[in-house]
From Swiss-Prot:
The keyword Secreted does not apply. This is Ribosomal RNA large subunit methyltransferase H. It comes from the Bacteria. Its main location: cytoplasm. It is an enzyme of class 2 (transferase). Belongs to the RNA methyltransferase RlmH family. Its EC number is 2.1.1.177. S-adenosyl-L-methionine binds at L71, G101, L120, S121, K122, L123, T124, F125. Keywords: Cytoplasm, Methyltransferase, rRNA processing, S-adenosyl-L-methionine, Transferase. The lineage of its organism: Bacteria, Thermotogati, Thermotogota, Thermotogae, Thermotogales. Specifically methylates the pseudouridine at position 1915 (m3Psi1915) in 23S rRNA. One of its GO terms (molecular function) is rRNA (pseudouridine-N3-)-methyltransferase activity. It catalyses: pseudouridine(1915) in 23S rRNA + S-adenosyl-L-methionine = N(3)-methylpseudouridine(1915) in 23S rRNA + S-adenosyl-L-homocysteine + H(+). GO terms for cellular component: cytoplasm. It comes from Thermosipho melanesiensis (strain DSM 12029 / CIP 104789 / BI429).
């Protein structure tokens, strides 16, 4: 099972240990690839539309026409059981790709192109935190799929 997560930017030093923790935990469940793409520009010097357009181009280049699930503030909120069901169903179809927007969100074009949009919360998170939360939910989802205990 291959899963790819496409996200603008990179992981910061203070979140690196959580990032590495979940990457290690997920190894036994899937072949996970995190694809970091360039941020669209300096938010102090470049307009939001230009930044989102630049990030869209980077993301589309990585997608290469594949369908994807978008993590989006305006997406459907689902619980962990629904997420594990989504994970199981998508993996039965083949590979799975998630896209996370950058610091300014995601372009309307990518929003329209997404196969499915889900929200991690009504709260707004940085793209780095969204990545960590997604990795945790992937781990939790695989534990649920495999009928394994998660909380000890």
């Amino acid at each position: 099972m291959k899963i790819e997560v496409i996200v603008p930017g990179k992981i910061s030093k203070h979140l690196k240990s959580a990032f590495d923790f979940y990457l290690d935990k997920l190894k036994r469940f899937c072949d996970l690839k995190i694809s970091f793409v360039r941020l669209g520009g300096d938010i102090n010097k470049t307009s939001k539309s230009v930044i989102l357009n630049n990030e869209e181009k980077e993301i589309l280049n990585k997608l290469k026409g594949r369908s994807f699930v978008l993590l989006d503030l305006y997406g459907k909120q689902i619980d962990s059981l629904e997420f594990s069901s989504l994970l199981k169903n998508k993996l039965l179809e083949g590979n799975l790709c998630f896209v996370i927007g950058g610091p300014l969100g995601i372009s309307e074009n990518l929003r329209r192109m997404s196969e499915k949009r889900i929200s991690l919360s009504k709260l707004t998170f940085t793209h780095e935190m969204a990545l960590i939360l997604l990795l945790e939910q992937l781990f939790r989802g695989f534990k649920i799929i495999n009928n394994e205990k998660y909380h000890y």
